[in-house]
Design a protein with these regions (language model features):
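Motif-centric detector for short Cys/His coordination patterns
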Residues: 1-88
Length: 88
């Protein structure tokens, strides 16, 4: 699908650069407030930088993953092509 993640690169801190199958690219920021429940391991800044792509999905070696379609929609709709994952 067009929202499949093709590439992820660690930028710094809690930011990742992502590129999708249709060429859209942007930045994903994972705020500490998001890292609760199953995502609690992402409180570890070092783990954030170990993101990989597996079959079009952004994931981590411990099995955590993020829905690529939601990430794509949020990056596309933001003029800065940035998606900030936060708990409200």
């Amino acid at each position: 699908m067009y929202w499949d993640v093709l590439e992820v690169k660690y930028i710094a801190g809690r930011e990742l650069a992502v590129r999708f199958a249709d060429g859209l690219a942007g930045v994903l920021y994972i705020d500490h407030s998001f890292c609760t429940g199953v995502f609690e391991p992402l409180q570890n800044d070092e783990l954030v930088g170990h993101a990989i792509v597996n079959n079009g999905v952004l994931m981590w070696p411990n099995g955590l993953d993020l829905a690529p379609d939601t990430m794509y929609k949020e990056i596309k709709r933001n003029p800065n092509h940035r998606y900030e994952l936060r708990r409200k």
